Amino acid sequence: MGIFSIANQHIRFAVKLASAIVLTLFVGFHFQLETPRWAVLTAAIVAAGPAFAAGGEPYAGAIRYRGMLRIIGTFIGCIAGLVIIIAMIRAPLLMILVCCIWAGFCTWISSLVRVENSYAWGLAGYTALIIVITIQPEPLLTPQFALERCSEIVVGIVCAIVADLIFSPRSIKQEVDRELDSLLVAQYQLMQLCIKHGEAEEVDKAWGNLVRRTTALEGMRSNLNMESSRWARANRRLKALNTLSLTLITQSCETYLIQNTRPELITETFREFFSTPVETAQDVHKQLKRLRRVIAWTGERETPVTIYSWAGAATRYLLIKRGVISNTKISATEEEILQGEPVVKAESAERHHAMVNFWRTTISCVLGTLFWLWTGWTSGSGAMVMIAVVTSLAMRLPNPRMVGIDFIYGTLAALPLGLLYFLVIIPNTQQSMLLLCLSLAVLGFFLGIEVQKRRLGSMGALASTINIIVLDNPMKFEFSLFLDSALGQIVGCVLAFTVILLVRDKSRDRTGRVLLNQFVSAAISAMTTNVVRRKENHLPALYQQLFLLMNKFPGDLPKFRLALTMIIAHQRLRDAPVPINDDLSAFHRQMRRTADKVISARSDDKRRKYFSQLLEELEIYQEKLRIWHAPPQVTEPVKRLSGMLHKYQHALTSS
């Protein structure tokens, strides 16, 4: 595809974006809004943001959800701005510095919460700064200004949602149905590969792809949930399917690992059975029927526990999958599966990374303030706003540097584009609302095409161009103000990018170590006699952490294998029949405390000390298990876990 070509699949969203901009512009001028530019800018960002992230037209519900987040973030930011102004109106410099800290605080929170919800916190950070900077000449108008901003943001979001609904947004339901069938086939093929005990690299690639696909399916579930309330039953089922898919991966990989030491456990009966190739979900369905008959004939005791558990999970997967596709009423059998176990949320391992983001945002905003006060530049306030916007939005993404570059390219492209609109197009169309709307529709259409291609600078160009052209009520064509605004955007983006480069994020290795120690802690916590704790479902949280590890360290197979081994150990120990007595219960609590100390240790020396203590406690625990005559289902997993921790002691304790 050429650089200027237009693909058919990109046209509908481009028209949708153009319609959102035109509708917002018309409503803004019709109802005499003070600054229609804010409403138009909001509509463009809310509509184009999900398209840029998806690399095409977003699915139904994505624009609506982003709009709701923007409303929430705007209201939080406006309230924070009002509180800061009321408390510190007599000390303007202190007031701006507190706003810089507030922007950093919101970035810190946005780095810790779910990525989908982080947008609201990033927006809350720079909204307060916008209000404080804008009301400097007339602080008494603060409540009116905050109210106007909130109302214009809401107008822009409503118009974007209306445009989305008019052009019949894509439903993700068919994609979900297809992925469920494809995922089931891939799960069966992984089990075939593990029973065949193929090459380790091939198995690693297979289970790694399945982890990514299961995570992607969870993202699809979130989209489906946003799409419509009629998918509520499908949403409940998909939550259960996420756990079942992860269970299938775990059981398959444990089957592979068992054969490293005890290949005789997998009998020829099962090797021959799993040698039959499958191509479709129907093939898997037929094979599962046969497998259940084989297990009934062989007997539960003669069937490896991993294959027995895998067959049960695959059967439940099939049952729930049919319910998702048909979206029928949940049956009693399904309800029993869905009620299952309470899911434990993952604890963030990126606290140090979040603190780095806090300092990046705060320092860049403070530097912007000093630059503004030192130069006295009339558009220094605009530069400050861009600094806050870039740092608040860039920090929550995997590659902040590329986001900074995107904004720089976008603001540079916005200068000639904005100049064309400011000097030629808008002055010649302001007498006709129709011509004005058409001129902005053309801008939205072509930039909408580029946004879907994820062209570098396209998103920044769309927002920056709308921000600098005259869309106020009434319109004022002062070239010096236009030039100041355009240059302020560029300078702000360059300063923000400079801070991103200078304040380096060296938290990657620390995050990796924390993640690995969290896997160890999860495996240790599975050794318990507490019935409630044993029923907790840690699997989604553990695989979420594994997915983060895979993104942080692409291609680092030893780390992935260690993490997967810890997950397998957790699942095996969770189901192990640990003898119930006060002595073991007290020792379980002691080991959990030691594992928590390993995670929270601030220095390598303390971490090594607590880790050595944990290894010693595991040796004592194994002796206690022998004294209390624990069965092999308990002693063998504990012995394997102890061996793994001894083997990877250096990787788990060194920064």
UniProtKB/Swiss-Prot annotation:
Keywords: Cell inner membrane, Cell membrane, Membrane, Transmembrane, Transmembrane helix, Transport. Induction: Positively coregulated with aaeA and aaeX by AaeR. It comes from Escherichia fergusonii (strain ATCC 35469 / DSM 13698 / CCUG 18766 / IAM 14443 / JCM 21226 / LMG 7866 / NBRC 102419 / NCTC 12128 / CDC 0568-73). This is p-hydroxybenzoic acid efflux pump subunit AaeB. It is a multi-pass membrane protein. Signal peptide: none annotated. GO terms for cellular component: plasma membrane. Forms an efflux pump with AaeA. Could function as a metabolic relief valve, allowing to eliminate certain compounds when they accumulate to high levels in the cell. GO terms for biological process: carboxylic acid transport. Belongs to the aromatic acid exporter ArAE (TC 2.A.85) family. PANTHER family: MULTIDRUG RESISTANCE PROTEIN MDTO, P-HYDROXYBENZOIC ACID EFFLUX PUMP SUBUNIT-RELATED. HAMAP family: AaeB. One of its GO terms (molecular function) is transmembrane transporter activity. The gene is aaeB. The chain crosses the membrane at residues 13-33, 38-58, 69-89, 93-113, 121-141, 152-172, 370-390, 407-427, 431-451, 481-501. The lineage of its organism: Bacteria, Pseudomonadati, Pseudomonadota, Gammaproteobacteria, Enterobacterales.
